Amino acid sequence: MKPQVVCIPGGVAPAAQRYAPLIAKAGEAADFHLKDLEVYNEATPPADFSVEHEVEAIDRLADSRGLTRFHLVGYSGGGFISLAYAGTRPERLISLAVFEAARVPGKLTTEERDFFSGLEAKLAGLKGPDFMATFVRQQVKAGVQPPPPPAGPPSPEMQKRPPGIAALIRAFSAYEFDRELFRAARFPVYYAYGDLSHPEQAVKAGILAQYFPDIHVHRFDGVHHFVPPEMIYTAEHVDALITMWHKAERSAAEPSLQ
């Protein structure tokens, strides 16, 4: 059986768009199960929206596909959700791959807190295009030109993004999580980020490297948070994921020595 891979996107591009290059380059090496974020199911986020809604939805998707255990891939906000899933349901994962998690679940370090409190302050009171422009600008390294917004009026789906991203930020802040849970992971982790993203991405990579027992961190050159998906899921990146998936499958099939 091929590796079964569940993919969770971030707060901007839907899963089909975000992971199209990954799926195309992987070819027949794996079966992919795309899961869009629950926060966008309705025109506006539910008042009680929480990280638990997203985590439980991954369970429902996996159960509906008959996946007892699987590989999980997350990007940005989907990276936070994937990390939360990995910490609370480690027995279901064979491997975890994340590109630039929006943040790491759990109590923030001083460096993290300074960045996120600054981000929230800059976004406060903004709506629509102003919200999105500020959100994008804050995710890249100083001096890096962020991509321009799409031409024309936003589609109905994209109009959901500013309130949806704001709801995700609130949910991430409210989510209670102990980072020590990561130490229980018995699966490999591949964490990637771009050298043109805000330096806090390197901070998060370093934090995760302190907790996960088996983690590989890769910094990609010439890449930031908002480059086109094909610049993130390059042949090099996809080959690394396929190698990890197959190695993890073999390890998972071996009898436990514990």
Language-model segment annotations:
Residues K127-A166:
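Conserved alpha/beta-hydrolase catalytic His-Asp/Glu region
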Residues A24, H33-H71, H237:
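Active-site loop/oxyanion-hole signature of alpha/beta-hydrolase fold enzymes
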Residues A185, Y191-Y193:
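Short beta-strand/loop motif that positions the catalytic acidic residue
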Residues H198-K204:
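Conserved alpha/beta-hydrolase "acid-adjacent" motif
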